[in-house]
């Protein structure tokens, strides 16, 4: 009897997005990308943070393309050899941010298709299972462009009420403002919030409960335009994330197992749990490489 071929899934485009800076969007993007690539998926990261392009220098490169996001957006360049750099991690590529003068922001504001340009372009990039887009930490046309280009938005939230309120005020308000695009066949992506930098002084249950209460109220009042949830997997504050960034490696390789007596998950466990919540359609594929998963 012949075995059925596994389903062919279309590329999923996920934005790591927040209207607030300093919530570890880049760290999440780099570590999720590295973990997914190590499981055998083809992953493309796009550094759309044109003000602080940290993701572009996070991983060492085996091949650096002559161009990057500027050529993609300004010139509609889609030749991988021109815009796609290869990291030292097998299966993990990146389109770097290369707009030091900040010209893209003005270009997008002046272009008739500025806010939807990336949506058209990114869907023409072949050969990837998942595309992860790191974003600028402020409400700009560049941030709106990434949201409208995405199939899923992952929004990091710090375990403090000020950050939670910014998520509720800034990110959800942006969805409200972009709702008119749905009339033209551009759906707004579902939204998943992840608690970042959780430490032992923070009461995760209280923060989680407070956010859930607000979201449930908004759901009852029909104020939420898309499916919105808070992930059950938090990212714990750990020196491993800073060390991994310094070494230019995914954190799951550095913090691969839970030491005896440790109560919080190791980074490998956290990345696996996050990926299972965010990308269940890919994580369940039987063809994935399971070696090295904690």
Where are these regions (language model features)?
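P-loop NTP-binding core
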Residues: 1-294
């Amino acid at each position: 009897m012949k075995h059925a071929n596994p389903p062919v899934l279309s590329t999923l485009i996920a934005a790591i997005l927040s209207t607030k800076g300093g919530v570890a969007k880049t760290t999440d993007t780099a570590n999720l990308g590295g973990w997914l690539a190590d499981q055998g998926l083809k992953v493309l990261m796009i550094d759309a943070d044109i003000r602080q392009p940290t993701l572009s220098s996070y991983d060492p490169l085996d091949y650096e393309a002559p161009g990057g996001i500027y050529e993609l957006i300004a010139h509609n360049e889609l030749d991988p050899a021109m815009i796609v750099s290869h990291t030292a991690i097998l299966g993990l590529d990146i389109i770097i941010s290369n707009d030091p003068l900040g010209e893209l922001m003005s270009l997008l504001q002046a272009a008739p298709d500025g806010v939807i340009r990336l949506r058209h372009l990114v869907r023409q990039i072949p050969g990837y299972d998942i595309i992860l887009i790191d974003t600028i930490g402020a409400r700009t046309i560049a941030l709106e462009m990434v949201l409208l280009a995405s199939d899923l938005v992952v929004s990091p939230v710090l375990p403090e009420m000020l950050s939670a309120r910014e998520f509720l005020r800034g990110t959800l308000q942006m969805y409200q403002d972009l709702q008119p695009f749905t009339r033209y066949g551009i759906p707004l992506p579902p939204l998943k919030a992840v608690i970042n930098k959780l430490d032992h002084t923070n009461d995760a249950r209280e923060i989680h409960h407070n956010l859930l209460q607000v979201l449930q109220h908004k759901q009852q009042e029909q104020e939420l335009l898309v499916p919105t949830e808070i992930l059950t997997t938090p990212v714990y504050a750990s020196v491993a994330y800073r060390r991994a960034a310094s070494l230019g490696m995914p954190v799951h390789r550095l913090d691969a197992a839970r030491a005896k007596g440790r109560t919080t998950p190791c980074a490998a466990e956290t990345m696996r749990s996050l990926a299972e919540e965010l990308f269940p359609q890919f994580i369940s594929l039987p063809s994935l490489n399971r070696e090295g998963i904690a």
